[in-house]
A protein has these predicted regions:
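Internal, well-ordered alpha/beta segment that forms a basic, Gly-enriched binding/recognition surface
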Residues: 7-142
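Short hydrophobic-acidic sequence motifs that mark active-site Asp/Glu residues
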Residues: 4
């Protein structure tokens, strides 16, 4: 009786009204008003901001999930029975991308997007496509130190993002000698690399520094992914993370072994430091009193749950790897619930 408007995606019957108890209710078809195709809109939904399971907002499957023994025989079917549609949807999307992309590229783009937080997700996602893993492998030498490799990747990603000082008209001159030396170095590297790049760099004005803690600025996040790529250059991020799930300590109990998987995987992100960006928030900014890691505990947890678990789930199902699927289930179920404030 309280219906005043009937809203749906497609109007199959083409009627402008429906009749309810002797009164006409107007209908609204949404399809003609969509700005993008449904597949693109689905990818744009920020699932990470959906409520996480908890006593105040748990869904109908949470009670059943909490009562499940980790040793139940159906555990290999993973989240089909666990009831977390959020993870399944993400795994499905990553699975679709795998039809045209490598596992390494899919994971790289997903991590990039996760580093973008609310205001820079699309920017980071685009950066991951115009400066792909193949581009990085092609342009960055492998026979150099991790630090030098990281700096070259930084030059590439900063240049393609449009965030280098030479690309920003309102850039203020560096305040100290070390910043001058660093900036000159990455600018010089970029001046050479850019000649071998086909894709057009982004505009620096597209990036948002508002409403973010300085430690979460795009510049710091680009430095973080650069270091991550540099440290795992030969093997690749995907294989390194996959290996952390394969190397469970058999001497430990099931619970302790799963905890070790979580700890070892998150440590890949928690132990990222850079000679420059662990001491600065922006190009030429004021030097920090204490060195800071590039990715904190909170963000590494978000990446573990929202990126690593669904990407590896897509991989496990593609490869029919029930052992990996079981380990993913156990790690997912054991992982402490993410903070309600996990998105900045």
């Amino acid at each position: 009786e309280g219906v005043c408007l009937h809203v749906f995606m497609w109007n199959d019957r083409k009627n402008k009204y429906i009749k309810l108890k002797n009164r006409l209710v107007p209908q609204l078809e949404l399809y003609n008003y969509l700005k993008y195709k449904l597949d693109k809109l689905a990818d744009m939904i920020d699932i990470e901001n959906y409520p996480h399971t908890g006593s105040a907002n748990a869904g109908p499957c949470q009670k059943r999930l909490s009562a499940i023994s980790l040793d139940d025989k159906w555990i290999g079917h993973f989240l089909d029975y666990a009831g977390d549609e959020r993870i399944l949807v993400k795994a499905g999307r990553f699975g679709k991308r795998l039809s045209t992309q490598t596992f390494e590229q899919v994971l790289y783009e997903a991590i990039m997007e996760s580093l973008g937080y609310k205001n820079n997700k699309e920017q980071f996602k685009h950066l991951g496509t115009i400066a792909s893993i193949n581009d990085i492998k092609r342009l960055i030498p492998s026979d150099v130190s991790i630090q030098e490799r990281s700096r070259k990747i930084q030059a590439l990603l900063f240049g393609m993002s449009g965030l280098l000082p030479s690309q920003i008209s309102r850039y203020k001159s560096a305040k100290d000698k070390y910043s001058h030396e660093y900036i000159n170095d990455v600018e010089q590297i970029w001046s050479v690399i850019k000649n071998d790049i086909v894709n057009k760099p982004m505009g620096g004005e597209l990036w948002s520094f508002k409403y973010s803690r300085p430690g979460n600025y795009p510049t710091r996040r680009i430095a973080a992914i650069s270091r991550l790529l540099a440290e795992n250059f030969e093997t690749g991020i995907f294989r390194v993370i996959l290996k952390s799930f394969d190397q469970r300590d058999n001497s430990k109990s099931g619970i302790e072994g799963t905890k070790a998987i979580i700890k070892n995987t998150e440590s890949i992100f928690l132990e990222l430091y850079d000679e420059y960006w662990s001491n600065y928030y922006i190009f030429g900014g004021r030097r920090l009193k204490n060195r800071e890691r590039l990715i904190g505990k909170e963000r590494s947890s978000v990446i573990f749950i929202n990126i690593i678990v669904p990407v590896l789930l897509a991989y496990a199902r593609k490869m029919n790897d029930t052992v990996l699927e079981e380990r993913l289930f156990k790690a997912y179920k054991m992982h402490s619930r993410l903070s309600p404030n996990n998105i900045t």
